[in-house]
């Protein structure tokens, strides 16, 4: 005979029930807290925009120096975008906007934009609508003279990495702006990461010897006198990054090309090209500087910047971090005065600094860049650190190789 079992029901102890309740409540609390945090805390968002300009063809792919007409258009668009967003209901969320490229097409030109905003994720959909509407309004009300087509505006969200890729191949673009004001490389201040991403350290047998400027993924521009007695390319490497001996990237040198008329005594035609054995990969901290057009003219008192890892004073110590300073262009007539350089500065050279001796490059800054910003704050290589009498002396400013005088020579050797 089979006997049916008798099941008995047992209740949970009170403390177990309380423990389970508190555990579930804690999980719900954390979940709700994370959700609120995710929806409320601001994040940075990146957008790529495009619109059409009819009837006029522009060609600025951002990889080379732009024409004056393209620069004027890009500057006007950027100014109008800045004004439009700063005077809108989303001015608090607005961070930055810029023109990336102007590309020709069959009926005119396409303008490529990059925009940056910061807002809570919950506002993503509505924010994109507001941004696009503001761009449409800007084109309709303020861009008629440029033949902009408001209906052509497109806007899409992109990742931070995609945003960086838009500008990494562009020349002369900084990631970070400089923060110094009126200090000098001699006893100067350190630069920020990404402020001068084209600056390179020419290392001879593993030690910093000269500076150079990255002008393409394979070529650098430097001073011929750096290599006059050290011309074996196998002895040279190139470091990129603001810390001279802890580089982001290092490359071997394949070839060094001197100017054919380089003269050591007077440092005439003090310019050299350095060809890398392997291309560099552009990043936000390693970028090329724009080469100027041969017809670019600088005026007295124009602002320029010199950078380098040279000594902090004559026969002094070397910095670890890249140094920077703002200088002024000095007219060659002043530089050639009897109390200055007495006619030794030729038309293929330029002077920069202060006659009072406030700022200067110094030893082992040779070959480094003298950079000039255009109206859009895009930087052009206008000079190469060449020579001077001491460092920061009164009436003895730095003398630089004038890059515009050698544009045809650079093109003949590199195709740039």
UniProtKB/Swiss-Prot annotation:
Gene source species: Homo sapiens
Residues glycosylated per entry: 72, 107, 315
Positions on the Cytoplasmic side per record topology: 1-17
Protein name (database record): Transmembrane protease serine 11B
Topology with respect to the bilayer: Single-pass type II membrane protein
Extracellular topology ranges: 39-416
UniProt key word Protease: yes
The entry's keywords: Cell membrane, Disulfide bond, Glycoprotein, Hydrolase, Membrane, Protease, Serine protease, Signal-anchor, Transmembrane, Transmembrane helix
Class of this enzyme: hydrolase
Domain (Peptidase S1) ranges: 185-415
Enzyme Commission number(s) of this protein: 3.4.21.-
Record-level GO BP terms: proteolysis
């Amino acid at each position: 005979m089979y006997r049916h079992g008798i099941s008995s029901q047992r209740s949970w102890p009170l403390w177990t029930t309380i423990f389970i309740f508190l555990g579930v409540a804690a999980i719900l609390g954390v979940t709700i807290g994370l959700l609120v945090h995710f929806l409320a805390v601001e994040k940075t968002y990146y957008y790529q925009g495009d619109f059409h300009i009819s009837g006029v063809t522009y060609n600025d792919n951002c990889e080379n120096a732009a024409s004056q007409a393209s620069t004027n258009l890009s500057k006007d668009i950027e100014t109008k975008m800045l004004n439009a967003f700063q005077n809108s209901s989303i001015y608090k969320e607005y961070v930055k906007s810029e023109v990336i490229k102007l590309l020709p097409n069959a009926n005119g030109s396409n303008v490529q934009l990059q925009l940056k905003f910061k807002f809570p994720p919950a506002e993503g959909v509505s924010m994109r609508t507001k941004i696009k509407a503001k761009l449409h309004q800007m084109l309709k009300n303020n861009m008629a003279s440029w033949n902009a087509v408001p209906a052509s505006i497109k806007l899409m969200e992109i990742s931070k990495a995609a945003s960086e890729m838009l500008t990494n191949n562009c020349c002369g673009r900084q990631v970070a702006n400089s923060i110094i004001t009126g200090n000098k490389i001699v006893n100067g201040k350190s630069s920020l990461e990404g402020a001068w991403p084209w600056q390179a350290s020419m290392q001879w047998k593993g030690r910093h010897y000269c500076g150079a400027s990255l002008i393409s993924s394979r070529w650098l521009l430097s001073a011929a006198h750096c290599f006059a007695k050290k011309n074996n390319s196998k002895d040279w490497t190139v470091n990129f990054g603001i810390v001279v001996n802890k580089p982001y990237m290092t490359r071997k040198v394949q070839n060094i090309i001197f100017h054919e008329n380089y003269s050591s005594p007077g440092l005439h035609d003090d310019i050299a090209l350095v060809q890398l054995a392997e291309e560099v990969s552009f990043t936000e901290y390693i970028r090329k500087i724009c080469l100027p057009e041969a017809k670019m003219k600088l005026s007295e008192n124009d602002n320029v910047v010199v950078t380098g890892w040279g000594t902090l004073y004559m026969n002094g110590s070397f910095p670890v971090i890249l140094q920077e300073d703002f200088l002024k262009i000095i007219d060659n007539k002043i530089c050639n005065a009897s109390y200055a350089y007495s006619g030794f500065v030729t038309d293929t050279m330029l002077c920069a600094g202060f006659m009072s001796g406030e700022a200067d490059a110094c030893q082992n800054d040779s070959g480094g860049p003298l950079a000039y910003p255009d109206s859009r704050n895009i930087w052009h290589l206008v000079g190469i650190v060449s020579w001077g009498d001491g460092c920061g002396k009164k009436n003895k400013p730095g003398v630089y190789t004038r890059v515009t005088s050698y544009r045809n020579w650079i093109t003949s050797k590199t195709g740039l």
